[in-house]
Regions:
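Non-catalytic beta/alpha edge segments that cap or flank active sites
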Residues: 1-166
């Protein structure tokens, strides 16, 4: 089929202001290149709920992205509002996938429990919140990788390819 089209959105005041290098976004873009997927856009936004929500909405509604992966803003600091912004614009919540990300991360570190990241869909686009730490991003990619092609197929209306269970 057609390669998956992915948007990477780094949510970080520090990266947005140029004070911090975006290592986590880089891990995702490297993975996209290695996997043979298409990087549609790689952007950095500040930890501002409306800015994040508007960006997610316009990327999903453009029809240009199958998947939007965010990194950052999922923790407990007062500026961490990525899940809240995501919640504003998703149409369907996918708590099972959020659990998969968290469970996988917790095999590496108990601190994965502190990520409040959401996963959900808007139209034909899957949106997943990854943590801001490079290690957390790596763990999330490993956890979600196997599901992405099937989810994208389903979101695009290809329902006949259900993996069969005996």
């Amino acid at each position: 089929g057609v390669p998956m089209r992915i948007v990477v959105l780094t949510v970080s005041d520090g990266c947005f202001e140029g004070k911090r290098q975006d290592r986590s976004g880089q891990i995702i873009t490297d993975w996209i290149a290695t996997s043979g997927y298409i990087l549609v856009e790689n952007d950095v936004v500040p930890d501002e709920k409306d800015v994040i929500a508007d960006k997610l909405k316009s990327c999903a509604d453009s029809g240009l992205a199958d998947v939007i992966l965010t990194t950052g803003g999922t923790g407990f600091s007062l500026r961490d509002v990525t899940p809240e912004a995501t919640k504003m614009i998703i149409e369907k919540d996918a708590p099972g996938l959020a659990n998969v990300l968290q469970d996988h991360g917790m095999k590496k570190t108990p601190f994965a429990a502190l990520s409040r990241g959401l996963v959900g869909t808007r139209g034909h686009t899957l949106i997943a919140n990854f943590p801001g730490s490079p290690g957390g991003v790596q763990d999330c990619l490993e956890a979600v990788e196997m599901f992405l092609p099937h989810i994208v197929d389903l979101l695009n209306g290809h329902t006949q390819e259900h993996p069969k269970k005996d």
